């Protein structure tokens, strides 16, 4: 199996590559580092937090989380739903883009916030593969003509029960992976506050739902 992306490969191919994230980023002229990031969290009231967290906690004992579909429907979907309610942000699911022959494919959750953001689902609990996929997706957004001018792009990779965040600094071409792992449902509130803060500024929040 080739250890690099070939023409006509898609984002899902980067998921399967067994190479270090640093090497993958360098193929496209970017640097990659992992460190503990102090990501800002929205500090205001989010009035669905307790209700949604309790619902997830209530149904989990009755679910078998042995399929990716189940995790997406019962762990990821409630977060996406609440994000829409809080922010009125347009979120496209399974969104297809093509930037070049080596940067193309499906983005699981494409968020049209003022600074485009993405959420990548890691199949089979494979966070390393999900990180590689997120790297190529962030690079694709950085090079995409439709991406608004901004200093950085925000991304997340999730298995459903575990979330990990990343940033692409556009001027320096540096991709940072947060070493902190957030678990749902225990860290549900932290995940929501990081996502809300990343997507919109406070004056753009849908105040009827906070």
Task: Describe the role of every protein-language-model region.
Residues 155, 159:
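Phosphate/pyrophosphate-binding active-site loops
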Residues 2, 11-154, 164-210:
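A short, conserved, highly charged catalytic patch centered on acidic carboxylates
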